[in-house]
Amino acid sequence: MKFLDEAKVYVRSGDGGPGCVSFRREKFIEFGGPNGGDGGRGGDVWIECVQGLNTLIDYRYRQHFKAKKGEHGMGSNCHGAKGDDAVLQVPAGTQVFAEDGETLIADMTEVGQRVRLAKGGNGGFGNAYFTTSTNRAPRHANPGLEGQEMWLILRLKLIADAGLVGLPNAGKSTFLATVTAAKPKIADYPFTTLHPGLGVVRSDEREFVLADIPGLIEGAHEGVGLGDRFLAHVERCRVLLHLVEGTSEHAGKAYKLVRRELEAYGEGLSDKPEIVALSKADALDADTLKQQLARLKRAAGGKPLVLSAASGQGVQEALRAIQAQLDTQGAEEAEAQPAEPWQP
């Protein structure tokens, strides 16, 4: 399935149905009173977060969503039926913005969450509504109110427990394919990964979701190489596994470049817990490995992990380090939540 993380859609709620002008007709009653019913309310436009989706590709080929109009009122004080709603189904992590792209309308973070985007127009009153003591036989009814219409921008930010970051060709996709059932494209050239990918890691009878973020380059926070789009997916990750290619010219410089982009982008990316690892260790001789580790240790300010997704070296240690960080965060979040008041 193709990946799409931004789409522009047009939504319109249904118009209200018109009221009815009608009079009661019965045997032996020459002038029956008014009995025109009200029109039905127009359908609403909803957005719903559903399970099983991880892309907005459905909105590439269909951009217009219109709810049905309300039915007209009828005689015998019969009100019109409400128009059918229109529902946009999106994956968790989707944000809904107004047409200006800046005004946030809804943030869909949990499966089952529903938000009304446009309310249907009210139905018009039938002539029975206008009966008064001085006007016993009104001959007019209201038309229904028009629905709301607007253009909206949908943006998807993947929700994952941990995210893989690094320069292009750092071995992120190979790592994801090794530890999950995901099948990302893997090749020995930069920018093989063009879209973020997700996989479920099962380690030591525990599970967490891992996201493969496409490689970042210098200027990514300004949009170079679609970097700002990729960095947006890092916002929802709780822990970062920063892979630095061991075969790069200088591991320390490669690490600092990615850190600068995370800091420049903002949104708290540079403050997220980070696990640093030197990847592709199987391709290095002992002296080069020692030199690159020393460079990376100085740049990161701590001892990095050594791993090779191809040979399996250090993979389990990296997964346990991620799980430990997630457990620590979970404990801190539980302590931060206010305790429920005691009730007898």
Curated annotation (Swiss-Prot):
Against SUPFAM superfamilies, the record matches this protein to: Obg GTP-binding protein N-terminal domain (SSF82051), P-loop containing nucleoside triphosphate hydrolases (SSF52540)
The cellular component terms of Gene Ontology attached to this UniProt record, alphabetical and capped at eight, are: cytoplasm
What EC class is this?
A: hydrolase
Q: Does the keyword Cell inner membrane apply?
A: no
Q: What is the annotated localization of this protein?
A: Cytoplasm
Biological process GO annotation list?
ribosome biogenesis
Domain of life the protein comes from: Bacteria
List the EC numbers from the record.
Answer: 3.6.5.-
Query: Which positions are tagged coiled coil?
Result: none
On whether Phosphoprotein is a keyword of this UniProt record, the answer is: no
UniProt cofactor(s): Mg(2+)
Annotated positions binding GTP: 166-173, 191-195, 212-215, 279-282, 308-310
Binding residue positions for Mg(2+): S173, T193
> Domain named Obg: which ranges?
1-159
Sequence ranges assigned to domain OBG-type G in this UniProt record: 160-327
Q: Recall the GO molecular function terms of this protein's record.
A: GTP binding; GTPase activity; magnesium ion binding
Give the InterPro entries listed for this entry: G_OBG, GTP-bd, GTP-bd_Obg/CgtA, GTP1-OBG_CS, GTP1_OBG_dom, GTP1_OBG_dom_sf, OBG_GTPase, P-loop_NTPase
PANTHER family, alphabetized: DEVELOPMENTALLY REGULATED GTP-BINDING PROTEIN-RELATED (PTHR11702), MITOCHONDRIAL RIBOSOME-ASSOCIATED GTPASE 2 (PTHR11702:SF31)
Q: What does this protein do?
A: An essential GTPase which binds GTP, GDP and possibly (p)ppGpp with moderate affinity, with high nucleotide exchange rates and a fairly low GTP hydrolysis rate. Plays a role in control of the cell cycle, stress response, ribosome biogenesis and in those bacteria that undergo differentiation, in morphogenesis control.
Please give the family membership noted in the entry: Belongs to the TRAFAC class OBG-HflX-like GTPase superfamily. OBG GTPase family.
Q: How does it assemble?
A: Monomer.
What's the protein name? GTPase Obg
